[in-house]
Curated annotation (Swiss-Prot):
Single GO MF annotation: metal ion binding
Regulation of activity: Na(+) is not transported, but it plays an essential structural role and its presence is essential for fluoride channel function.
Record's catalysed reaction(s): fluoride(in) = fluoride(out)
Transmembrane annotation, as ranges: 3-23, 41-61, 76-96, 103-123
Statement: the UniProt record of this protein carries the keyword Lyase: no
Sections of the chain in a coiled coil: none
Role: Fluoride-specific ion channel. Important for reducing fluoride concentration in the cell, thus reducing its toxicity.
Topology in the lipid bilayer: Multi-pass membrane protein
Source organism (scientific name): Xylella fastidiosa (strain M12)
Family statement drawn from the similarity comment of this UniProt entry: Belongs to the fluoride channel Fluc/FEX (TC 1.A.43) family.
Pfam families, per the entry: CRCB
Protein name, UniProt field: Fluoride-specific ion channel FluC
Length: 133
């Protein structure tokens, strides 16, 4: 990757990441207000939404061949990278353990992983359907 492409990629990732992080904040805030702090609905929601959209975008970007790299940087690496959050997932598991709600750790991880896999596959299926030439 030459220097110009590298800098363009960095700019696209930063742009997408800023928007994705802001979107994560908005979704998390809305769900916290709506459902309270008993369960990390915001993190679960952004990770599942991100899984679905990532599956869709992977197919959509791949259909564009070499012209898809800017979209991959902006949308997958930047936007979805900023939207989803593994570190928050792990931190929330630690909070459950420290508050003696260890059973919630297993439930939360199972829901996140199982539905995350389901959503990424559903997104990819939708992407294949929509982008089918």
């Amino acid at each position: 990757m030459n220097a110009v492409v590298w800098w363009q990629s960095l700019l696209l990732v930063m742009l997408g990441g800023a928007f994705g992080s802001g979107l994560r904040f908005v979704i998390g805030s809305c769900l916290l207000q709506r459902f309270g702090a008993g369960f990390p609905w915001g993190t679960l929601a952004v990770n599942l939404i991100g899984s679905f959209v990532a599956g869709f975008l992977l197919i959509w970007v791949d259909k564009r061949g070499s012209a898809g790299w800017p979209w991959r940087m902006l949308l997958i690496v930047g936007l979805i990278g900023g939207l989803t959050t593994f570190s928050s997932l792990m931190m929330e598991c630690l909070v459950f353990v420290r508050s003696e709600r260890s059973l919630m750790v297993g439930l939360y991880l199972c829901i996140t992983l199982l539905f995350g896999l389901l959503f990424v596959f559903l997104g990819a299926r939708l992407g294949a359907f929509v982008c089918d030439d």
